[in-house]
Amino acid sequence: MIRKILPTVAIAALSLAMTDIRAGQAASQTLEKIGELGKITFGYRETSIPFAYLGADHKPTGLSLDLCAAVADRLRSELHRPGLEIEYVPVNASNRIPLLQNGTIDIECGSTTNTADRQKQVSFSLATYVASPRWLVSAASPIVGTNGLDGQTVVVTQGSLNLTVAKKIIDEQKLKVTVIQAKDHAESLFVLGTGRAAAWFEDDILIAGLVANSPDPKTFRMLAATYEPSYYGLMTRREDPEFKALVDSVIKEKMGSGEFNKLYSKWFEGPIPPRGQNLLLPMSDAMKARVASPSDAL
């Protein structure tokens, strides 16, 4: 990428803007990069409905992207850069952390679970969703519980935290199960739908989003069993707590003003692109608690 050389006046204005935004803070490499290039780069998932995915116009959309857009709006104001641009870079479960670490993206706007292990590599914003993993099977399948998976093949998305969770369940219940991996959530659903796997294990909301936008949602059903909740957040670089603080302040402001609740209703309780499906998922008590008291705790 060719970097533009800023004129002296622009550099002076940028210096003043960076002084404003850093009042009481140490320097943020991410903010400096964004200010210098005049753009912020969003990493987004292409099939993580309704958090980040490609809509009817093949443009990135979703709850996480709405929140990231609010971060960009804050930067336009605080950096005095009304023309700040947004660049979109597709990421997947395998490359999202490396692309954040090497500076290809400035923030990941997806559906990534905050874990203690991942915190050794990246930082997470305040929780933006509380999920629980579940098994999805064909509606015609005789499987009603995890015992029914014995002797079967199941699919998990490559790079998903739920690969570890699925293997733990299989080991604890002493099941003989073959686990295969798909490159993304859309392929996982395809593998299940074509009969190459008897079940798909993933977070309930991601399953609901993909199924709702599939050609025939009634051909699938989730098993009743749920597991420990997980917390989604926007990912930022671990070595840049100042940028994380800015992102957190944007989310906290949205939650305090009631705007987050409106965004939640938009994506979980109303028709969403590309097919106008409604996920019909009211906010859970666990999510309500996080909105009332925003936190990035596990």
Labelled PLM ranges:
Residues 15-23:
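C-terminal segment of classical bacterial N-terminal signal peptides
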Residues 46, 129-137, 204, 212-251, ...:
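Periplasmic-binding protein-like
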Residues 95, 109-120, 165-172, 191-228, ...:
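A ligand-binding cleft/hinge motif common to bilobed small-molecule-binding domains
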